[in-house]
Amino acid sequence: TIPEMTARFTDKLQEREIPYIFIDSNVPSLNPLAFFGQKSDQSGYFAARMAMMLGEYPQGIVIFRQINEGRLGSNQQENREKGFRKYMQEHFPDCKIVELNLYAKRPDEDEALMNRFFQENPQITCGITFNSKVYIIGEYLIGHNLKNFKLIGYDLLHRNVSCLKEGAVDFLIAQQPTTQGYSGIKSLCNHLIFKKEVKSCNYMPITLLSVENVDFYLDAHKK
C-alpha cells in the first residue's frame, strides 16, 4: 500500500533522527513532524456538494480515476473519494456513481476508454476526478466537442487551467502548494534552528476556482 511504501523511507529517517514533514498528502500513522495540506476526506465531501449543484442534481455521476500499478495514485485520492462517497450516501443515496479507470502507464488507451464510456452512458453529464490530471478528460471533451458535460478537478497544472479557461472544466479545487512548501520549510527551520514547538497538523483552505477568479488566485500566489 502507499503508507507501507512511504514507511520504508520514513523508517530510515527515524533511525537517523532526521525530522520530516508531509506536504499535500498525509499519513498520520508515520508520525511526521508536521503536515501541510487539505483535509482530504473533507475536500472530497465538499467536491461532492459542488458537483451535485453544478450538475443540477443529476441521477448519475462519474468518477474518473487514475490507476497506477493497480491502485489509485495516492493516499490523498483515496481519502477524497471516501469523503465524496460519504456525502453522496448521506444526501443523494439514489444517485448512481459510475467509475471510469484510466491507466497512468497506458495513456494511449484513454481515448478508447472514454469513447466507450460516453457512448454507453449518454445520461451521465457530470463528472469529477480526484487527481491532478483533469486535463485528460477536459482535452477529450474539447476534441469531441462535448460542451454540455460538467466537470470538476484538482490542481492548477497549466493544462488544467487551459481547460478551465476553454470551458471544458467548470471548477478546479486548489491547494495552495506554494504556501504548503513555504510553511513546511519554515516548520523545519523553527524546529531545528530555533527549537520552537511546531504544530503537527496544518490544514489548508479548500479553494474553489472558476474561469472568473483563477487569474486573481494565480497572481496572488506568485513568488
Regions inferred by a protein language model and the residue ranges of each:
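Hydrophobic alpha-helical
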Residues: 1-14, 84, 98, 102-159
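Short, structured loop/turn "capping" segments at alpha-beta junctions
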Residues: 56-61, 91-99
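Hydrophobic alpha-helical segments within soluble ligand-binding/sensing domains
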Residues: 35-61, 176-193
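Glycine-enriched alpha-helix->loop->beta-strand junction motifs that scaffold or abut catalytic
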Residues: 146, 168-169
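Conserved acidic residues
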Residues: 33, 125-126, 170
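Hinge/beta->alpha junction and helix N-cap segments in small-molecule ligand-binding domains
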Residues: 37-43, 64-83, 95-112, 129-133, ...
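Hinge/cleft segment of the Venus flytrap/periplasmic-binding protein
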Residues: 71-72, 88-91, 176-223
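Flexible loop/hinge segments that line or gate small-molecule binding clefts
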Residues: 8-42, 158-165
